[in-house]
Structure formats: structure tokens, C-alpha cells
Amino acid sequence: MGTVGRVRLIRPAVALVTALSLITVTASASRPPERPVIALTDVLPAVAEASPAPGDGFRLTSGTVITASGAAAPVAGRLAEALRPGTGFPLPVVADSGARAIALVLEPGHPDEGYRLDIGPAGVTLRATRPAGLFAGVQTLRQLLPPEIESDAPQRRRWVLPAGTIVDAPRYAYRGAMLDLARHFHEPAEIRRYLDQLSRFKINHLHLHLSDDQGWRIRIDSWPKLTEVGGAPGTGVGGAGGGFLTKDDYRELVRYAADRFITIVPEIDMPGHVNAAQVAYPELTCDGVAPRPRTDMRVGYSSLCVSADVTYRFAEDVIRELAEMTPGPYLHVGGDEAMSTPHGSYLTFQKRVLPLVRKYGKIPYGWHEIAQSPSAAGAVIQFWGRERNSPSVATAVAAGSRVVLSPANRSYLDMKYDMLTPGGLAWAGYIEVRTAYDWDPARLLSDVPESAILGVEAPLWSETLRDSGDIDFLAFPRLVAIAELGWSPRAAHDWSSFRARLGAYGPRWIRDGVGFHRSPQINWS
């Protein structure tokens, strides 16, 4: 265990990735300018309904414009930014035009985040009730054009969208990813890069794990030593993860995510996983003695002092400051692996802390252990277990709680793909792409009805991560499997279709410089 902190993921050499990219570009240049039109169903995640039409689709030309007004205009601007590099076309965004157009329209009548995309030779119309629905439709539209359209240099190609109609909406309201900043700190630029990739697959929540035994990664003004000590150099697993987010950093990430219709969910883990906080403030221990800093990967040894008033002053200050700078509805209070907190004390803690989240206008959110507390009624419960039933979660659901599913043996992105995977962990088993894909959220917990499922989330813990390349390698392509489970209807769940669509997406990741795992289960283009 002592060497784990020095483990780094071994990704394909930069030279190899560059060579592959050059091969792709060279091959593209040697092909005829026309290629087969991508089908309406060749999209990740799978669309709900697709009705191809005979005849020609819509051809982008130098005269094409994008029309949008009001709240639709920013989404139209992002579409134009994505399509200009490869086409070399100006693609101006205008309020109205008689020219050949891609029109983005806000109108009533569509499901929340849903959209309708109509494509014909005379034009394209994308309709939704909310800007989030338009943004989801834009992600679909981008995938209906060849990967080269978003390259850095204009391509000599005729860009054609397939004719027909797509009507689409998400299966679940919550489709999330989690990134652990505590075990290893990831800089804001790395988080923004991850947000960019998440948004391509209609992920709409990013859960940031901001504190743990090894580090504290968010500035709290009323307790400044949390980051001065818990975010100092030498913190993190193996001592290789120093750093923290200032409040300005955090607010900018919230804004950046919101521009991509992603909600940030902050997490402060307690009453366990608090060693870093106790190193900074020994009064948070029952004996007033600071524990030693920890850079190993063990869990379950730390606990706040449940009988001390200072514990609740600390908890309230942290919750209040986080709530003030978090516009999203959720605030995650952890609650997992509190093995050093006696059961009665754990219930006492949750009885006092969960109402504090509501006091500051947020919905309490926690790992499924909080379901043991009657105070968790109405909270969001994040199930991370491997069992097929959970009586405490079922009881919380009966009292009004909703559930986000993150089964460790299906959705934990830090698990190895197989026994030869460099980096990553294996305590929940190996998770190849098909393992991540082949489950139904509605049937995971036998004692929880689908009506209580808010959605799914794919956590990525950072014990063996060090940089964006490590994030890429473990998150992709498995995160796309979880995204499809969250967005696409149950009827669209088909491994053969998914693996074909995933394999065809590979050139887009190569273009974006994403060092994804080339799973042998997938025939990569």
C-alpha cells in the first residue's frame, strides 16, 4: 500500500497518439470529399425516436446562417463556434433570415430538456421549450456531421446532415459524473476540460468531492486553516496532490458549467473522512489533539466529535458558505464509511446536520448510509453499494427521498478495466465497457420503484490520478455507457448498437486529444 501513491496511469505515448492523429488526417485528405451521410440513429447517447426521410438532407454552405433570438441565441452561438473551424464558413447567428438556415426555436410543449430536430434540404429546425433542450439537441446535431467538422483547419468537404426527424428527451432528470478533488487536487483548467467532454453526452450534473482524510479543497472563510493546512503541498494520496479552489475559482467553475447546462454539486464529507479538517483544527476531535496527516488510502478511521458544540458550528459554517456560492439545488454532506462513529452518534449527527442544509435553501444529498436516519426523509440518497436491495434506502424512499444510482461494481470509473490496467483500483471488481453498460437502473434495487429514481452518476475517485490524461483514460469510454443509461429510453438499450456507435466516436476523441481506453470490446474506427 505504501507505493500506491506513486502509481501513475500509463497512457499511450504522445508520439503514438500524434501518429494516429496524423494517419487520420492523411486518410481524410486522400478520400473523396463526399462520405456516406451519418444516420440519425448514430448518436451517443441513443435518441428516443428517429424517423429518417428519403432524399437529400441539409447541406451546409458558405451561405448558411444560424437563426435564433432571446435565450436561444447563446446556444446558437456555441453551435456556430463548434462548426466554423472545420467548415471555414462564417455561419453568422442572426435573429431572422431568408437564407438557408439552421433555426433554433424556443416554444412550449416539449418535455423538460427534450427537443425536436427536423432536417430537410431547405433547412434545419431545432425546437425545445428550454435552452437546456436546445443545447441537448445541438449535441445531437454535432454528432450527425463528420468528426472533421470540428478540426482546427477548414476541410475541403461537403457537409451534409441526414434528412428526417428526431424527437428526444431524457429518461432521468439527473445524469451525473463525480470528480474527487480531495485525494488528488485537479486544477480548474482540468475540471473545465472534463466539463467540456461531459457536456457532449448530455451529462447535466458534476459532483465535486471537495474534502476527505487526505485533503481539503475549497476555501471556507470562517475556517481558513482548512485550506491553508488541508490544501497545502504534500496533501493528497502519496503527498502528490496539494492545492485548493478559491471561492472565485469555484464560482467561475459554476458559471462555466452552467454555460454547458451542467449543475455543480459540492460535497463536504462528514462525520467520517474528516482527518484533514482535524489536522487543521484539533478542536474538531474529542480529545483536542491533532491527528497526524494522512496520505495513504485507508478509510473509516476518522470521525467528528458528535457530542461537541464546535462540531455543529463547523458544519453550519461550511454548509452556509457553500450554499451561498452554489446556485444549484443540491448540497452533498457525504455520510459514507463512518466506521469510527458509533451508530447512535451517527444518527444524532445526521439529525442535526441534514436540517442545516435545508436551513440554507438546499436539498440534502448524501451517500446511502444517511438513509439510516429519519432526518433523511426528502433527501437525495446516492446508492453506491453492490447489493440488490437496501431496506434503509427503501424506507427513506417511502418517506419521500429520491435515489441517484452509482453502483460501485458498474459505475465507479476508478476501477480497473481488467487485471492489466495500469493505475486504478479493483476492490469493486473489474469494469469493462460492457459491464458498465449492461444493467438497468430501474431494476437495480428490487425494493425501490423506478418512480423514486432521480438518475445515475459515475464517480471517479482520484487515488491513482494525477492529470487530465489519467481522467481521460479511466472515464472514457465507460462514462458514455452511464450517460446512455441516464438519457436513453429502456427500449433503446442494446449492446450491439451501443458498441458500434461508440466505436465510430473514436475519431472525435482523437481529434479532441482525449486519451481514451481502447477497449478490446469495441471495434474502433
Predicted feature residues:
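Flexible, acidic glycine-rich loops studded with aromatic residues
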Residues: G88, P374-A377, G385-S525
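Active-site neighborhood of glycoside hydrolase catalytic domains
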Residues: A277-V380, W384-S401
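Acidic, contiguous N-terminal accessory segments
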Residues: T3, L9-R11, A15, A19-S21, ...
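Conserved, mostly hydrophobic/aromatic
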Residues: I66, L83, R130, A177, ...
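Hydrophobic faces of well-ordered beta-strands that scaffold small-molecule active sites
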Residues: R175-L179, L206-L208, I264-I268, L331-V333, ...
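Feature activates predominantly on carbohydrate-active enzymes
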Residues: D112-G300, V310-Y312, R320-A323, P327-Y330
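Active-site beta-loop-alpha junctions enriched in small/polar residues
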Residues: A182, S211-G215, D269-H273, D336-A338, ...
